[in-house]
Amino acid sequence: MGPKVQPRRRGLRIAVWSLVVVLVVATGLIGVVLWQNSYDMDEQRVSIRHGGHTLNGVLATPKDGRERHGLVVYVHGDGPIDATHDDGYKPIWEANAKAGYASLSWDKPGVAGAPGDWLDQSMDDRADEAAAAIAWARARPDIDGDRIGLWGASQAGWVLPKVAARTPVSFVIAVSPAINWRRQGRYNLLAELRADGASAARTRAAIARSDTTRRLLKRHATFEQYVRARGGDADGMTADRWGFISKNYTADATRDLRALRGIPVLLTLAGHDINVDTADTERVYRKVLDVGGALTVKHYPDATHSLLKQSIEQSDLKTTLTAVFSPRSLFADGFLDGQQQFLNGPVPAGARGGGGTGGSGV
């Protein structure tokens, strides 16, 4: 009987030690995740009244012991985005905090339980919303009203200058902004077709469908007319989305950008942007804003439209793992430092605008 007991004991010891190793590794991984997803700033939920409803926001402030801070107000890009952009903003907020700046963002209407529907908004509606948030922030004793600026990505390019025309801002950070809605839509369409290796025939057919959509928009066609024109195939379009595009498809930032003259502007562009024609964006920004000498342009060759590393974004698995275990590493090399350096630089309180001239698929 004795010799038979030893193998069972050895097997039990192996199982126990295997379990211990698994638990140690799991604990270590959990520790890494918690550490990497902890940020050197304080966060609080805030409520901002605007237009008879409430904006549900997040205010992130530095842990530097100062009583007052400058503020970066966030203007989202396209889509149903919550205040933290599913925590994707937090590494950028941390960079702002290192420069002594707080960050303010809010859930889009209809997102995360917020009242309203973001698809009902025009770019002017979005600008009014941001201006109201700035007014709310200026009334707070912990915010330096002379150091409030804007940060906006993609679709926000049509909103940022409208905000600056409504209320004074000290600076603007524009990330992958477009200039003209229709040009941007056509650029994106062709870029995606090239990326897919589309044939000439497929490309011609896609352009023809896009041209049909443009004609329908120009005629103020209803969603039902759009669906009929496509032979009954909505191709993912919804009535609400069609209404949103109908409100905004004529957007063009060229004239509005004049409101940013004399304001420090950081234009951030990606080398692998298939959503926005960055060459067109840079050309227009330089043409309109170089006169005041306050424009800074930063290029990130390895970045995508979202300023993430292309090598990571092209893989869903890499994106997920990096977001969990090293979220700051998602961004293109130098991007977070570049944001911080801009805020650390000369952003004079006197360089404030206000009162200036005030993915679409088409």
Located regions from the model:
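N-terminal cap/lid segment of alpha/beta-hydrolase-fold proteins
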Residues: V32-E67
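Short beta-strand element of the alpha/beta-hydrolase
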Residues: E67-G77
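The serine-hydrolase catalytic nucleophile loop
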Residues: D82-I92, K108, A279
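Conserved alpha/beta-hydrolase
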Residues: W93-G113
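Alpha/beta-hydrolase active-site loop
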Residues: D120-P141
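Accessory cap/linker subdomain of secreted extracellular hydrolases
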Residues: I173-A259
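Short beta-strand/loop motif that positions the catalytic acidic residue
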Residues: L260, L267-L269
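Short alpha-helix in the alpha/beta-hydrolase fold that links the catalytic acid
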Residues: V276-K287
